[in-house]
């Protein structure tokens, strides 16, 4: 796979409300592990739409990985112009920083938000232009990524790689073998 799309939960869907939330280190570590394996198999481009949560965290991981793998590129292709318009200032700053560092920035529809159809267009575009999808999503825990995943499932031979809650738990346990004992004391 040379080009992958990445999608996943928004921060509030995971109960994450701050950039310094401890859970983020484990999410980013799992993203880094998955992306590194794909890079070593020939990954060149990561596509995100710039949504808060898994996509922004992926961008941050890509920027870190570019230090070791400078050929890796990030594209931010939004569903419409000004998607950050209603975000708070902190999220806007984070988003604008991602756009400034991205290797390619574009919009699918070249106009402001008009209807949910623009999200469908974005999903279709991403799947048609990529070789696979990496999703921070657990089918047992519903959330916003389900729309992109449902679209991807309509395509024959389009690989979907999941990062599930079990994967994240394994990442936590790998980094902190005493995690379960600490949880029991709480």
UniProtKB/Swiss-Prot annotation:
InterPro entries given in the database record: YspA
Signal peptide as annotated in the record: none
Family the entry assigns: Belongs to the UPF0398 family.
NCBIfam families: PRK13660.1
Identification of the protein by name: UPF0398 protein BPUM_1952
Annotated source species: Bacillus pumilus (strain SAFR-032)
């Amino acid at each position: 796979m040379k080009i992958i799309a990445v999608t996943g939960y928004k921060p509030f869907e995971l109960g994450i409300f701050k950039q310094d939330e401890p859970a983020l280190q484990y999410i980013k570590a799992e993203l880094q592990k998955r992306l590194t394996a794909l890079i070593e198999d020939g990954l060149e481009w990561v596509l995100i739409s710039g949504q808060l949560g898994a996509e922004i965290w992926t961008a941050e991981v890509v920027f870190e990985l570019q230090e070791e793998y400078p050929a890796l590129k990030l594209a931010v292709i939004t569903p419409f112009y000004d998607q950050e318009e209603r975000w708070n200032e902190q999220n806007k700053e984070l988003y604008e920083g991602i756009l400034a560092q991205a290797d390619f920035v574009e919009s699918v529809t070249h106009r402001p938000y008009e209807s949910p159809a623009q999200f469908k267009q974005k999903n279709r575009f991403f799947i048609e232009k990529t070789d696979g999808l990496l999703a921070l999503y657990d089918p047992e825990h519903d959330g916003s990524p389900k729309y992109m995943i449902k679209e991807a499932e309509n395509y024959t031979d389009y690989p979907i790689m999941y990062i599930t809650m079990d994967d994240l738990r394994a990442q936590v346990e790998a980094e902190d073998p005493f995690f379960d004992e600490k949880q029991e004391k709480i």
